[in-house]
């Protein structure tokens, strides 16, 4: 299996508001950077979407070192999702899981890969996280895409 390093970040100008994702993907000494902007969304949706988009870029199953400053995303996919699926996508207190369709998409993307999840402290000088932050902000400042599934309720 190829070893791929992925760094992601999501940004939102206002919450909700215009949002963006930033991705740095590194394989075999090569680095690819991605920035996309969304017209109306939330910060958590952007954190999730960044990881989904990054994993979708991989053409074959890989060993992935995935780095994100989103504790929400990391805890959701490594801890909470198992209970959510058992409880028909309800939280521990019986409420519907927010961003359900993105969690389902992320759960589908991770099935192909062997992933090591790492939380990175945001805004702390971590090179790739800072790059992702800039890419996400650039996307949020120039949004062109609709965040399908976003519901303001």
From Swiss-Prot:
Cofactor(s) the protein requires to work: Mg(2+)
Enzyme class: hydrolase
PANTHER family: RIBONUCLEASE H1
HAMAP family reported for this sequence: RNase_H
Family: Belongs to the RNase H family.
Function: Endonuclease that specifically degrades the RNA of RNA-DNA hybrids.
Protein name, UniProt field: Ribonuclease H
Organism annotation: Actinobacillus pleuropneumoniae serotype 5b (strain L20)
Gene: rnhA
